[in-house]
C-alpha cells in the first residue's frame, strides 16, 4: 500500500495568522510613556484626541448678532469683511443666515489667539455703522476701542428736544461731526439716539466731552474753541 505525501500546511486554519496580525497591531499601537512609565494607546489616536479638540474649538469661538437694519448692508459688503479677516488675521468666518449671526473661529494657521477678539471687534464696529475702511483700523492698529452711549445718558430729552440735540451734533451738512472727528482723530456714528465713537482712549474722551457739551446746549463755536485748545496742548506734550 502506497502512502501519499500530504501537505499539512494546507490544513492549517487561517485564524492563527489573523491572531498574529492582531497581536502585531496591538504592539504597534501600544506605547510606554517615558515620563510616567504607563502603557497606553498612542496619542495620535483620533478617539483620544477628539474631545479636547472639540472643547478647544468651542471655547475659541465668537458670535456677533446682526441687527435687522444692518442685514442688507452686511450682505453687500461681505467680501470686504471676509477678505481681511481670513487673509490677514488667518481666522475662519461665516455668516449664519438662520441665526443671523456672524461666527468667527480660530483656525490652524492663526498666529495669535488675540486675533479672534480683534476680528470680533472689527465686525461689531461695522455693524454699529462705521465704514469698512474705518473699522479696518481695529485690525491694523493697537489700543483702539469703540465706545457707545446714548443721549439720555447725558441728559433726558424727549420728542423734538432730542431731535434738535441730534441736529446740533451733526451740524449743517455734517459739519459739526466732521470737525470733532478731525480735531480728535476719531470716527463718530450717530445712530438715532445712540452715539458710537471709534478711536484711542484719550481721543474718545475728548470727543465724548465735546458731544456732551453740545447735548447740554453749548454753542458749536464754543465747543470748537475748547477742542482746538485741548488738541494743541496734547500735541505739544507729544
Swiss-Prot record:
This is RNA-binding protein pno1. One of its GO terms (cellular component) is nucleolus. It holds the Pfam family KH_PNO1_2nd. Residues 162-211 form the KH domain. Belongs to the PNO1 family. SUPFAM superfamilies: Eukaryotic type KH-domain (KH-domain type I). The keyword Nucleus applies. It is found in: Nucleus, Nucleolus. CDD domains: KH-I_PNO1_rpt1, KH-I_PNO1_rpt2. Keywords: Nucleus, RNA-binding. GO terms for molecular function: RNA binding. Its main location: nucleus. The keyword RNA-binding applies.
